[in-house]
């Protein structure tokens, strides 16, 4: 037994001797000896157990649980929302489950985050820009099939829409997607081959052109005009934003509504329009089943994901520009004013789902490559 357990036992020796003496005087010598042997053994065991219990530094509340750590991997623009939400969940979980939760957080482009998880970044939870990225992790064997049905809204926990950012005063009078087809209108956007945001941009343009022209041929023609007006395709949305704002390139920029709202909150003056025919940018959440099984974090990971759908968490998403998926939050006056209704809003499902979309638009030789070939970029 270590030294920290010996002191309480030592203090009890005199008490044991006194009791033993009393027993000896009360009973006969033979009976007393037998009784005292049993009594001393029991007393020593009892006192030793009491001493160990009293001084063991690892003992605490009988309901206390071992600390747990979660790794959250998400796309870059969610950082501010998660930094506000995580402390609320940690406090709630500690109060309800008597368990301390800490978070490791990683933020970056959705595509690069997807590759990192597949290559070994042991995320417990992934919150990505598009379901196609989550599906890649599923196909790598890390997420179980059917993850979309595990949580409300087909796993979509945050939403936005593409908007067109213009120069101060909108000198090119850009009001809709079709205005980006006009000769002499320079557009800044990223490459859909490398950027998740740019894929949403492309789909918004295609969706509007198809509904206006009524055929794939008309849509392809319209988007060829649009991309002819793009001087250079940047690698990602951040480079596109820098090219427009910092370098002064282009007459227009396509970006997430939430990015523009956040920029406005930081004091940056931004002029933008929300086209009436648009597409919902849906961002999914998923638990990485293989990793939570390895880490023993399934229970708390699932609880955190469920918490993200709560009005409390959805309010934090809305504060930084994401359209809430919780209807009660969406109906709050401040958010009704912040997020104008879009008259004709399509979804990925309306376009056939991500497998069909990737095959039709972004695979080698598909629509985007055909457009690039026509303009000989």
What are these regions (language model features)?
Residues 130, 191, 257-258, 320:
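Short secondary-structure boundary segments
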Residues 5-39:
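Bacterial N-terminal signal peptides that target proteins for export
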Residues 212-277, 284:
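Ligand-binding pocket segment of bilobal, Venus flytrap-like solute-binding proteins
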Residues 53-194, 367-377:
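N-terminal segment of the mature folded domain
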Residues 48-51:
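C-terminal motif of bacterial Sec signal peptides marking the signal peptidase cleavage site
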Residues 2-4, 292-377:
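Extracellular/periplasmic juxtamembrane helices and adjacent flexible linkers that interface
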Residues 169-175, 194, 207-215, 291-301:
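Short helix-loop capping/hinge motifs at secondary-structure junctions, enriched
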